């Protein structure tokens, strides 16, 4: 090792401030299979070299501080420090770089997403030498992945529990999201499930407010589930939101859901926190409950291109912490999400192994070993005319959540559910027959509407509804 990167006690202590790059920029370093690797989008302040900025990120997110301290001599920092080992300029940007940092596995507590993020996306994001900083991707080594339980059950086990194969899972978020009484809420759940949906969902805003306490909602929703199951012969469920102000209260709600015999509960994993989410995931596996995950607050963290954390990192963190579903954007609906980027983190959720893919924004190869996959959920501003595109984009292993696209049907909730189920079945049949959903999608929906008055009415209501705004977070492209 070169003298300038040597930090062992034998060097001796010399007080003062030195450049980060003398210790933490190590372009000769070859990452180990056990290292956690991070790709940061770094925007230095004017006059700060990229090497110093990248080294500062490595230092401040691992063992470094702003000055030399004598206690450095009491340990081997070369064993524990983060290393900025490679820097690429961002195409099309004058002062922006992708800095790759390797972290030794010794730095992190086993099975703790909370500890990973406390270090890697902690105080360094407020560092004055940086104008902006964004964590674009992480490579989690198998040695660390195996310290996590991961999703409670995974895709195949969920399909077996529900006895649903060969198509997407179809759901609906109950609206209005706030203000319904528990009994009226249960009525809406029943009507949607009876009409052909597999699941209904608590809106993420619904916890236990004065107008509808959680226990009442759980009871009326369970009654709706059992009634719809008896009438349709299909397994049904409702995502009962167990998110609460304390972990103890959250688990209490999950316990009550299990006692009711329902198949699934729900958690807001970002607002609730990773520690709470991991605890709930463990409870769900131990007690046979599926776990639906909502990502409320994600856009605060991931929407800006130059600062924060990309959702692909949050998706990987969720697969570690645990969840059987997670909302992942729609591409075609009202919420942010470019197609290639969205499919990139959909791959990270479902597949056992993903390669580096510049076209999908994947910076590292990632193996998940035996960790179960997570079903991506498309939700937000989608309706029957979107069904061909959603079927083509996401494939069978996904969940479609139509809120307004079900409850906004002019004939009521059950006909809205019928319209969505007919549209889905028509698209699946057309795909299985070899038809091109991208080119023939509208024709497929119109043909199905000829024998389904519910679908015909839905088509008429939403024929002009589009959300054509450019995505904020897009792939980097070179300036012409």
Curated annotation (Swiss-Prot):
The modification N6,N6,N6-trimethyllysine is found at residue 14. The basic functional RuBisCO is composed of a large chain homodimer in a 'head-to-tail' conformation. In form I RuBisCO this homodimer is arranged in a barrel-like tetramer with the small subunits forming a tetrameric 'cap' on each end of the 'barrel'. Its main location: plastid. It is found in: Plastid, Chloroplast. Heterohexadecamer of 8 large chains and 8 small chains; disulfide-linked. The disulfide link is formed within the large subunit homodimers. It catalyses: 2 (2R)-3-phosphoglycerate + 2 H(+) = D-ribulose 1,5-bisphosphate + CO2 + H2O; D-ribulose 1,5-bisphosphate + O2 = 2-phosphoglycolate + (2R)-3-phosphoglycerate + 2 H(+). It comes from Trianthema portulacastrum. Its EC number is 4.1.1.39. This is Ribulose bisphosphate carboxylase large chain. The modification N6-carboxylysine is found at residue 201. Mg(2+) binds at residues 201, 203-204. One of its GO terms (biological process) is photorespiration. The record marks 334 as: Transition state stabilizer.
